[in-house]
């Protein structure tokens, strides 16, 4: 049986198209098994710890449900529930937890931190998000595209917004490896790192994919099968709202933009999304700037084209596939 036993899941560039296809197929199979009530628990007796430097709803729940479904025990260490970096270094923490647990999940700031965990724990480590990478999210994204479009090859997907963020960067890697036609629609100031773009274009050349980085809406969005966006300001950057809005307001996903994509184009977002006035941030932005939504309008978020909650659910199945393939 093809598997990834004992491997960490830190960066999509560590994996081949065959590896990722295996994980996607396994994700879909695990989802079908759960819905049919015939899921086989392959992680009984396993212990998994998840370390979160950033609070989370979807990522924490996805890790916990994935573990519970497969019979594993899980421990959550939140931003205030441990001594990491205060009384004990991450290097020492990794060696301690590696003696107690079979795998470690991490959600935080630095990619170097999750790599330190992997280097010193001697158990599989799963990257639930860092400032530059979000590989489990992209697995869920690709799974969702495959479910709705039937295939990945040649699918045209456009990311609108900050081309330097962890979602755009991770999509760039994943789409290049898997042969999609990926475009980033962003202001020039927020284009992704040039070295990463060159790497992605090289991978796309081998996979039959295509990479386009542009500030032209027509070039990016025309005939797209998938339109994707993310929040314009990440946690801890709230003071930057005004600058970001001025820079990105022309890159909002709205009816005008969606009309340039295919009629059956799907809209995707990793969540949380600022699309209405029901959050403190959404109301504050509306009061200050009068925007109908921020990165996406309510009309598009709630439209029949929106698959954002399919993506959210698929986080569980994608993370479960990573756990099963590395520990099962």
From Swiss-Prot:
Its EC number is 2.1.3.3. InterPro entries: Asp/Orn_carbamoyltranf_P-bd, Asp/Orn_carbamoylTrfase, Asp/Orn_carbamoylTrfase_sf, Asp_carbamoyltransf_Asp/Orn-bd, Orn/put_carbamltrans, OTCase_ArgI. It catalyses: carbamoyl phosphate + L-ornithine = L-citrulline + phosphate + H(+). The keyword Endoplasmic reticulum does not apply. Keywords: Arginine metabolism, Cytoplasm, Transferase. L-ornithine binds at residues 166, 230, 234-235. GO terms for molecular function: amino acid binding; ornithine carbamoyltransferase activity. Carbamoyl phosphate binds at residues 56-59, 83, 107, 134-137, 270-271, 315. Pfam families: OTCace, OTCace_N. Pathway: Amino-acid degradation; L-arginine degradation via ADI pathway; carbamoyl phosphate from L-arginine: step 2/2. It is found in: Cytoplasm. GO terms for biological process: arginine biosynthetic process via ornithine; arginine catabolic process to ornithine; citrulline biosynthetic process. Gene3D superfamilies: Aspartate/ornithine carbamoyltransferase. The keyword Transferase applies. Belongs to the aspartate/ornithine carbamoyltransferase superfamily. OTCase family. Reversibly catalyzes the transfer of the carbamoyl group from carbamoyl phosphate (CP) to the N(epsilon) atom of ornithine (ORN) to produce L-citrulline. This is Ornithine carbamoyltransferase, catabolic. It comes from Borreliella afzelii (Borrelia afzelii). The gene is arcB.
